[in-house]
UniProtKB/Swiss-Prot annotation:
Gene assigned in the entry: adc
The protein's Enzyme Commission number: 4.1.1.4
Any one GO molecular function term: acetoacetate decarboxylase activity
Family of this protein: Belongs to the ADC family.
Protein name according to UniProt: Acetoacetate decarboxylase
Species the sequence originates in: Ralstonia pickettii (strain 12J)
SUPFAM superfamilies per the UniProt record, alphabetical: Acetoacetate decarboxylase-like
Top EC class, one word: lyase
Domain of life: Bacteria
Biological role stated in the UniProt entry: Catalyzes the conversion of acetoacetate to acetone and carbon dioxide.
The keyword Cytoplasm appears for this protein: no
Reactions catalysed according to its record: acetoacetate + H(+) = acetone + CO2
Keywords: Decarboxylase, Lyase, Schiff base
Length: 247
């Protein structure tokens, strides 16, 4: 294969059979279970990179079921997302996500900079309870529960919240194994959102300590709200807003 062909066909690895296809990436009937809780403010600020700012010591613990996604297939994801501001405007910062499917794991890390690890999350309904769990190997590290569809939420308001920008710290190591080749803050949006439903109810969240899935490093001090959302949406491509290596 000549250099020109490599340059023109290169998208992702392996060159001749990429781990994921080009976008756009559309999600049908994407199901969110989000528990927002209050945590230790000093620990939280220590985990959020500047120039992002933390207005309140809050964390959104998410379980997300994606049964029908373009190119990525059928998978589930779980992790912690932090409400932040950037240049005075509200958004979110994804601290860590754990999922059970290779294409979105590879694509999420390589394209946007999603901090993804392989694990075993689940989101199910058992009779009258919405249940989210995260296992890292044989160890249960997160359990969330909520009363199933106790009260409807305003769809327009929930759509506005989903439309807020999400920020990611994208890090790609150099081939020397010692330094970062890429270290940048990226921003992406969920677009073309079609809301199917949104509900709330009484909720609980338990986090357990694990060396490699340290979700409990941001302890649960108080449950603030819980949301169950179903929507069709497209995960938009990203843009770089801050380059740490250029400073």
């Amino acid at each position: 294969m000549d250099i020109k062909t490599v340059r023109e066909t290169a998208f992702a690895m392996p060159l001749t059979s990429p781990a994921y296809p080009p976008g756009p990436y559309r999600f049908i009937h994407r199901e969110f279970f989000i528990i927002t809780y209050r945590t230790d403010p000093a620990k939280l600020r220590a985990m959020v990179p500047e120039p992002l700012e933390v207005p309140e010591p809050l964390v959104a613990y998410e379980f997300i079921r994606m049964a029908d996604s373009t190119g990525f297939g059928d998978y589930t994801e779980s992790g912690q997302v932090i409400p932040v501001t950037y240049e005075g405007k509200p958004g979110t910062y994804t601290l860590a996500m754990y999922l059970d499917d290779h294409p979105p794991l590879a694509g999420g890390r390589e394209m946007w900079g999603f901090p993804k690890k392989l694990a075993s999350p689940k989101l199910v309904t058992d009779k009258d309870t919405l249940i989210g769990t995260l296992d890292y190997g044989p160890v249960r590290v997160a359990t969330g529960t909520m009363g199933y569809k106790h009260r409807e939420l305003d769809l327009a308001e929930q759509k506005r919240r989903l439309e807020r920008p999400n920020f990611l710290l994208k890090i790609i190591p150099h081939v020397d194994g010692k330094t970062a080749r890429i270290c940048e803050l990226s921003r992406n949006l969920m677009i073309d959102i079609d809301m199917k439903g949104a509900w709330t109810g009484p909720a609980s969240l338990e986090l357990a300590h694990h060396a490699l899935a340290p979700v409990a490093e941001l302890p649960v001090l108080e449950i603030v709200e819980a949301r169950h959302i179903i929507a069709d949406l497209t995960l938009g491509m990203g843009e770089v807003v801050f380059d740490y290596l250029a400073q």
